[in-house]
Amino acid sequence: MPTSDPGLRRVTVHAGAQAVDLTLPAAVPVATLIPSIVDILGDRGASPATAARYQLSALGAPALPNATTLAQCGIRDGAVLVLHKSSAQPPTPRCDDVAEAVAAALDTTARPQCQRTTRLSGALAASCITAGGGLMLVRNALGTNVTRYSDATAGVVAAAGLAALLFAVIACRTYRDPIAGLTLSVIATIFGAVAGLLAVPGVPGVHSVLVAAMAAAATSVLAMRITGCGGITLTAVACCAVVVAAATLVGAITAAPVPAIGSLATLASFGLLEVSARMAVLLAGLSPRLPPALNPDDADALPTTDRLTTRANRADAWLTSLLAAFAASATIGAIGTAVATHGIHRSSMGGIALAAVTGALLLLRARSADTRRSLVFAICGITTVATAFTVAADRALEHGPWIAALTAMLAAVAMFLGFVAPALSLSPVTYRTIELLECLALIAMVPLTAWLCGAYSAVRHLDLTWT
């Protein structure tokens, strides 16, 4: 071997109180050399046989980078190196530029902007603006002072609904965007309902609501068919509109007052909620059927797994739509009853009680549903209870302390149900008690409905003659 080989380095490595002379390759990374050096020192008893992280450094210099070679670090023949264990904790980093360090820290903690969140925000904003504009048009139609351009207003609203429906088709069929398609379909349904309400001449009444509900049902079904997206939501809207249309049709035929129509619609909605599971099974084709002559040896006569899976998914979608529709129709009926009875001394308490019981029943049903369905029940129940509380507070404006105390109590109950109750482990007796309370509240809907329909007054004024 020549006296001076440029590919080798003759160095002395110190480790604690021991030292060893080694010839190391100059083109091998330091991280590859360290295990061999540790093994040599370990054989000589200079290092304990414990796992640790080692570093190699020159005298009075920082540790050599593990990815570099001895030649790159400037190590020559005769150099003295020190093998030592690395510290358990890395040194605290120091910042030369405070502004750059602050920006880097914020970049690591800030969440990236989610495109889905932006799209949902835009969809929610568009829906709320459309609903707000529709409510203002309905308010103007109910007022006796605003009577001009009613036909033109209905035409513009109908044209806007058709345009929204056209853009919904483009969004779903061309761009494959279900969020935009569903939002535009809902907007078209709102415009269709408002156009139907304004199409009836005169001040809106039961007949106007009937036309509006049928227009909303037709628009939602049409949007669902031509767009192919948002089937669950649009089905729920259509079913809810059909229930409202049926209730208003009864009111138009019998000339019943609004509290009676609303209370009967609410009671019917709870009845439909009880049979919604059976309806979903029937509509999905999962109802048990007796085949005419089933041969056990004929495998083709039995349903396949794929077909059963498709029907099961269809039944789940139908159940979600029906539950949402009937919960919404119960909410609309209860709110309409509470608002219609406001100012009527005899029936005001009945409307408030009906809305409060309806909200409680919907909130109780939210505990036994999954995430999607419980959210619908919770929103409907909270809206109904809030309406009942608002009407009751407006009826008793002179009792300010009681209103403040009731507000604080309801807020505390809401916080308890949202944050504390989910973490509690309830006993079977408690579950049975809650179910019993739900049954009692459902039974109480019948006498409340009879009260609001005027059944008790009619019986009281009967002139029965016993012979």
UniProtKB/Swiss-Prot annotation:
Its placement in the membrane is given as: Multi-pass membrane protein
Protein keywords: Cell membrane, Membrane, Transmembrane, Transmembrane helix
Transmembrane keyword on record: yes
First-listed, main subcellular location of the protein, grouped into a coarse class: membrane
UniProt subcellular location: Cell membrane
Do the record's keywords include Transferase? Answer: no
Q: One Pfam family for this entry, by name?
A: YukD
- GO cellular component terms attached to this protein's record: peptidoglycan-based cell wall; plasma membrane
Q: Which residues form a coiled coil?
A: none
Q: Which residues cross the membrane?
A: 122-142, 152-172, 186-206, 209-229, 241-261, 264-284, 319-339, 344-364, 374-394, 401-421, 439-459
Q: What else is known?
A: Was identified as a high-confidence drug target.
Regarding protein family, the annotation reads:
Belongs to the EccD/Snm4 family.
Subunit structure comment from the entry = Part of the ESX-4 / type VII secretion system (T7SS), which is composed of cytosolic and membrane components.
Q: What is this protein called?
A: ESX-4 secretion system protein eccD4
Q: Which organism is it from?
A: Mycobacterium tuberculosis (strain ATCC 25618 / H37Rv)
